[in-house]
Amino acid sequence: MQTATYTPGHSAPVLSLMAQRTAETHAEFFLPQLIPGWSVLDAGCGPGTITLGLARRVVPGLVTGIDVEDSQFAKSREQAESEGLNVEFRKASVYQLPFQDHCFDAVFCHALLEHLSDPAAAFTEFRRVLKSKGLIGLRAGDMGGILVDSESEGPAQGLATYLANREKDSRDPYVGRKLGRLLRKAGFDLQRITASYEVITETLLKIGPSLAAQFAAPSYCSLQDKASDHSLFVALAWCEAIGRAE
């Protein structure tokens, strides 16, 4: 069964943190590839803050952001209107994109594949809507490379619980390292693949209680407990890939 579930949920703290992501901080590897006038799809756009950055890059081109949770779009819609950006937000699933074949010059996808039960099916749709020689830019986390240090065992236990829930729901927490393989299998020519780290300590401190409530897992709460003594360090591995439709 093809499903897309955002494991951290959509609580106010989670949405607030997602909204802090920008194209400059989380799509930097792909921005130089974009050309003014292009039509771009931002798949799994969340609150749309990255979408806005992509739109600024391709003015006067159209950037379309899609997500299964459309309650996130309001602020970015207002911002796009105030800046005069050519942006459209739509509720849609990457498994069934509501677009004609070969209509986008580029597809961007950030932090989505690790939340899909069938990433390969999404790649098939990405390939369908891309024009010939169109570009795809992907960024996905890889939990196999996560770094954790704390004076307490609680944070590591909390992250282990999070990882177990992802795997139980048929999500691949190690999809980042597989981006090149997935691109090739979907018929793309792999142009570039890189990896990077992001320190996410503050992020986890803020969303720990939300995760605890969602999964009824008290070990998540220990993340919040470490806020005062600064003993916690967590860094997440990201993998980035660029492909071209053949």
Give the location of each predicted region.
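Conserved Class I S-adenosyl-L-methionine
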Residues: P173, R177, R192-E246
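A short glycine-rich, Lys/Arg-flanked "PGG" loop and its adjoining helix->strand segment in the class I
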Residues: A120-L135
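Class I SAM-dependent methyltransferase Rossmann-like catalytic core
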Residues: Q2-T22
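A short SAM/SAH-binding and catalytic strip from SAM-dependent methyltransferases
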Residues: D105-D118
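Conserved alpha-helix/loop element of class I SAM-dependent methyltransferases that forms part
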Residues: Q20-P36, G53, R57
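Class I SAM-dependent methyltransferase SAM/SAH-binding core
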Residues: L41-A43, P47-Q96
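A short acidic, Gly/Pro-enriched loop at the edge of an enzyme's catalytic core
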Residues: Y95-A106
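Conserved catalytic/acceptor-binding region of the Class I
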Residues: L135-E202, F215
